[in-house]
Amino acid sequence: MLARKDTRVKSDFSEIIISLASPESILERSRGEVTQPETINYRTYKPEMKGLFCERIFGPVKDWECHCGKYKRIRYKGIICDRCGVEVTEKKVRRERTGHIELVIPVAHTWYFRSLPSKIGNLLGFPTKKLDQIIYYERYVVVQPGIKAEEGLSYMDFLTEEEYLDILDSLPRENQLLDDSDPKKFIAKMGAEALEFMLSRIDLDTLSSELREQAHTDTSQQRRIEALKRLKIVEAFRDAKTRIANRPEWMVMRIIPVIPPELRPLVPLDGGKFATSDLNDLYRRVIIRNNRLKRLIDIKAPEVILRNEKRMLQEAVDSLFDNSRKVNTVVAEGSRVLKSFSDILKGKQGRFRQNLLGKRVDYSGRSVIVVGPELKLHECGLPKDMAAELFKPFIIRRLIERGIVKTVKSAKKLVEKKTPVVWDILENVLKGHPILLNRAPTLHRLSIQAFQPKLIEGKAIQLHPLVCAAFNADFDGDQMAVHVPLSHEAIAEASLIMLASHNILNSANGTPLAVPTKDMILGLYYLTKGRKSTPEHPVKGEGMTFFSAQEVIIGIDTGQVSIHALVKVKIKDKDEQGETIEHIVDTIAGRVVFNQYVPEELGFINELLTSKKLQHITSQVYRLVGTSRATQFLDDVKSLGFRNAYKAGVSFALDDIKVPTIKFELIEQAQREVNAVQENYLMGLITDNERYNQIIDIWTRVNTQVTVFLMQELEEDRQGFNSIFMMMNSGARGSREQVRQLGGMRGLMGKPQKQLQGSVGEIIENPILSNFKEGLDVLEYFISTHGARKGLADTALKTADAGYLTRRLVDVAQDVITTEEDCGTLRGVTITTSINKDEVAESISERTLGRISLNDIYDPVTNNLLVNAGEEITEEIAAYIESVGIESIEVRSVLTCETRRGICTKCYGRNLSTGKLVQIGEAVGVIAAQSIGEPGTQLTLRTFHVGGAASSIGVESNIQATDKGVLQFEDFNTIKTTNPQGEQLDVIISRSCEVRLLNPQDNRILMHKHVPYGAYLRVKQGELIEKGQEICYWDPYNAVILTSIDGEIEFHSIEEGITYKEEYDEQTGYKEKVIIESKDKTKNPSITVKGSSGEAINYNIPVKARLIVEDGTKIKAGHPLVKIPRVVSLSKDITGGLPRVTELFEARDPSNPSIVSEIDGFVTYGPIKRGSREIFVESKDGIRRKYLVPLSKHILVQDNDYIKAGYPISDGNTSPSSILHIKGPIAVQEYIAKELQAVYRLQGVKINDKHIEVIIRQMLSKLEVIESGDTTFLPGQTVSKFTFREGNDQLLDKKVVIDAGSSSVLRVGQIITARALHEENSNLKRDKLSLVQARDAQPAIARLKLQGITQASLDTKSFISAASFQDTTRVLSEAAIRGKRDRLQGLKENVIVGHLIPTGTGLPRYSKMIIGLREDYENLVASREKQAATDNI
């Protein structure tokens, strides 16, 4: 056998190109042909020669020993045995040497014709069905008509066997003897051979220009789509040619590679049986069929038998490559489907996710965790035995170094005996050697933290109580894993970055995570809570005055002063300017104790401590005095909290639960209201829907009132020292919801729903009036079980969804890394206060904190410069900006960052987990994904605790003034009317009325709201109103259509059974007319109101509307004609939440999207066409747009309404993609961020906007080409912004030839520079020939495309990352055709190929650094200078 070059790949490569393998390249890599299906000899257990495990091809089974045993030992290295032909080498070569199988006939690769879109099919223009007929030997295809072309037979015609034989009979005999290249010869083939023949003859360049021409000029939409589909594949091959040889005919194989035997092992089991990889079975089938076919051809078997055998060989190769797609899959015994190459790659158990992205780790252990209250924040307790096992190699080395033992073996024995010297050494080894603790599920980066281990007795790991929040751990049997960082770099990283004391802040929102909770907070609350003396309970030391804090502490220690006593103390404090002052304060003795531990930079904290307050204090401590003192503070506070909780002795008794006495009165009153609503319903005044909604509202209100009284009673009980109230109020345990159920009323319960959208009856309308103290009756208990079980079922089902959401988020954002300081962009986003239902959800100071200002910001009052452009907005500046009333600020944002790869630090701003500006090399994408995904998982587990009590979303039915101010209406159109209660009011009849509340002094806008159509006004334009005053109100349960004139009613096309049906309500005996969708599309129900002076207005009536007027009756202006019920009162829990988050990130269009106007203009109704109403919007400058609204939809606009761009014409949810196209990327980002924040805010989860922005940046990173111009892009193609810009830049100042004239150099359609054109024309002019005509090259036009996160992950630049995410086979086959290059720039692809990830110190710029001593460097510089000086002389 020839010596051959080493085919192993060096590990320091920087990119990977994937392409189709040519037969030559497979042969070049192969060590020999496998011709026998045998594996090993059943007697000797040695591999059979020429078989699948052959040693001659793949290398020896034992190190340095040939097959026959003639050469043994390393000294014969490299010799090839003359008897058996096996090279004497190591056995590990069996992991890398490949073989091959030479097939008798070509075979099509299943990936390229089975998986849709079929690559071979598109290239040749065959549908999949026809392709299958060729490949599986059912039809012949004409590949060269030859002389039969005259008889109408053409290229690519299909022939049955009879037709083929008839043609052969009719041919002249010599025709078949001609050479294949002779155009007169008739050739028809079947099977992959035909495809190979046709693919090899394709001229891609010609085909490309033909298809482009067709896509441009064809009138049929279908044929154009077809042409573009084919063009995509053609262009992929043409593009690949620029990087690597890639021929279409290589999609058909003549040679199959056989992978190394160690990668498909055959393992002997006990009892003489063997376990084998499925690939061996699949390979055997291929070899057996190939050999049989060879024999059949040799003995000249009949065509029928040959054809059947060829088909079977094709199927065998299909199942080797992909056994899951085929109808007739190959199965092992017990009907288990064999795992083919595709199955080995894809899925969670596939090569990518199981072995490359998730490896198992050595030097690790796991154990149960228990609390370690006396540990420092950076410490954890590690069981001795565990430590001895984990650090064994280190101990062995020290034992040998100290000369205690001589060999490793004896050292091992010593460690196993656990002699005292071992513990001594272990103590030393552990100094400065941190360990990592990890709690599954690892949802964010704080689930793995480093600690300094302390050796402890016992078998459980001790964990510091403050890190439980980050790990989401509790001590009910949780287990944690321990990992040992081995290398110096790993130890440095663990100690400097991952140590628990460095991870106090939460990267999702910048608030401290390591904050005392549970009993610690209860102890601190108890300590800082004051109590006044009463005759029964005198408080020691009340009213005393102390000279210093020390005196107070002596008083407490000696029992003279109670910790709850109100006292006066002289203390050091900070004034407004931050200067230290001394003064006397009224405080509580316990607070003086607490302040002993507070850094003096914060001054004296004179407040009752709750968990929120303590979180705020911790964050101030961290900011003002740094990490190490913050850690010290937390440890002190932890001990103080535990000590006082133990001293307080807070218990939980039945009598601590107080039931408010007023509860029963409130319930009776509510019962009366409910009866009144029921009466109204029975009299037919309201619909069933309204009745349900009103009842739910009554009970929701009563429940809230009862809760308020309950809280008051608890607070007044024992001066607020009621133990349940203390637990709840301090934030230690229990929520208002839970306490309400104990002592108030359980209230309304949710019931399980089949569908997600709330249909009527999402909430059971009979509330549970009892609480847990009084006890529930049987019916109430039964209703309760609904909710409780729903909670448990949700938890079980939704956790997987949340995990999958996190996985998709990480995948889409994994390559977002900060790569440069400043991208220099001039764009940014405008940030204002975020308002949610009249309340400030997030103030402008919270939203701008840690961002970089885009422009200089000046104080509006003094005109002083507050922040320079490009400077960070700090806490102080943010607070000041809010105080002076600046309403909006432009800041840098990830969305507008123009860094080509990754993002820049200025656009990102502050790193929330450190409170400083983000560094270069931070993996901000992964942090963003974790920050959004981690609460997602928490959201699913949240329902579990409330036990299914439903809280309904209050329905908005009025607008109240948020401040005192002057009213200003915009687009204001009203008519006078009387409301149902008989009051004289104005009613709004314009669609886009806005109300603003202005500050009378400086005309600042205090509130800005949309006023809905049909709202009754309580105020006048320009009126000065007070805070809380009602501006307008409307019916929250029904949309209405009002008449704007007095007159008589006339019905059109309102016919029973055709356009409306009468709904008979059995309980009330009333009938209602409800408009239905008519089968007869010409009938369009409408009502005309004829005025007395002859004018008439026509109103179109939508489906589901309920008529409240009769034909021929009189009506007054401003009265409703119909009511259209709105669907409201949905229960709000996270099941609504998680699917909503997914829907937003996947950018899915809602199930019933609203139709939105793209321009400002006046509405006119058009005719009805095909079940849709045409609606025109015409702007003032004459632009006209047409919209088709299905008749089943409620149209929100009437004739002649003036509406603005983005206003919905029909009801439904707005789709994010229409927001993008109408209002632009910033609007869609605001919409998605606002909707997401609303879901998370309901659960009390705070996520900083910048994380959401990072994900949205990835969703908006691509463009969709609309017109390709003269570029190589295709219409409808998705390209990245930078690729698109480059493509267009290449056409700058270029010309396109439209008539080549007499030029022999240029051809039509060629793109050339203006200079080349000028030169060519000069030459032609000189020779007096016709000149070349050319036009300017047209650039492509594209628009932003909003992709869902799954789509964006699959469209990432790196094919390795995409393949490891989803659709592995499709991604890889498309990448191979494109000859894709992966430059390994993201995290995932580097993990897969085993490189350092390009973040932090793994950035390429650091890899070439040389590290040494400063002295050496200075000496080197000095010697260089000396050398230079001597050279000059």
UniProtKB/Swiss-Prot annotation:
Organism superkingdom: Bacteria
Q: How is the cofactor bound?
A: Binds 1 Mg(2+) ion per subunit.
**GO:BP terms for this protein?**
DNA-templated transcription
Q: What is this protein called?
A: DNA-directed RNA polymerase subunit beta'
Q: What is the lineage of its organism?
A: Bacteria, Pseudomonadati, Bacteroidota, Cytophagia, Cytophagales
CDD domains to which the protein is assigned, alphabetical: RNAP_beta'_C, RNAP_beta'_N
Amino-acid positions noted as binding Zn(2+) 2 in the UniProt annotation, renumbered to this chain: C823, C897, C904, C907
What cofactor is this protein dependent on?
Mg(2+); Zn(2+)
